[in-house]
């Protein structure tokens, strides 16, 4: 019986068609409470639980999930779905509040007391900001948020002071990556206050030619400025990726076709495969589909990139290794 990978991803991601380059977009707002020390300085776990209770009371329309009541596998599933950060999982008194389709998550007691996230599948940062801002307004009505008239919102990390906003877009960039253009792009956008990271943010590894592009600074900038500037940067990167793909198709079609079919062969025939190799093979097959080299019915890149992660493969009643189960899953779904 074929495994149902559709159950692994959030409802918001199921609702939209996959695009050649944009995987997802996110707006994150960092907020702190005036009457509590910052989470990294909590004198006891009880202080963290008090913050959780206050935020829960302020956001009664969201569902609370306390991480200290979850097993490690359940926590890592939330990380894989980008609903919480790896850092939140490490905190002893932490929680996340979610809406029904998981397009909104509110992390409690990570680096800051509150981190509001709004998630979407296209370049709709302004809409996402409006959604996050509504949550922020609810918190502001019920809680005493740390704010300075001259500096703006006060955050644990100095780079977040100001709007407290991080806007980011996840991009699939196999062309630029294969042609080794990513370092140059990263250096260029860094000069304008933007950065490129792995799929889980700062310090994380790049999998499957997927990169996260985000703003670095918020002080002295409005939310609209950050969104407009990031949108412009992302559109420039997308255009470069499209140009590279056209060049690969026109001038390196045999090599590109070979790369695509080699990856397809590996995915369809492997009995053992690592997360890293699987992600890059999937990326190259998606490139082949986007270039109309191959046609695979029901190929869901975003869903597979979630499903191949270890938290969704671990099963105490199954004696296969994770790498074996990953290979079996990919053979089932790529035909």
Curated annotation (Swiss-Prot):
SUPFAM superfamilies: Glutamine synthetase/guanido kinase
Domain Phosphagen kinase C-terminal stretches: 21-244
Gene3D superfamilies: Glutamine synthetase/guanido kinase, catalytic domain (3.30.590.10)
Catalytic activity: L-arginyl-[protein] + ATP = N(omega)-phospho-L-arginyl-[protein] + ADP + H(+)
InterPro entries with a match to the protein in the record: Arg_Kinase, ATP-guanido_PTrfase, ATP-guanido_PTrfase_AS, ATP-guanido_PTrfase_cat, Gln_synth/guanido_kin_cat_dom
Any GO molecular function: creatine kinase activity
Keywords for this protein: ATP-binding, Kinase, Nucleotide-binding, Transferase
Enzyme class: transferase
Biological processes annotated in GO: phosphocreatine biosynthetic process
One GO location term (cellular component): extracellular space
PROSITE patterns per record: PHOSPHAGEN_KINASE (PS00112), PHOSPHAGEN_KINASE_C (PS51510)
HAMAP family documented for this protein: Prot_Arg_kinase
Function: Catalyzes the specific phosphorylation of arginine residues in proteins.
The protein's name in its UniProt record: Protein-arginine kinase
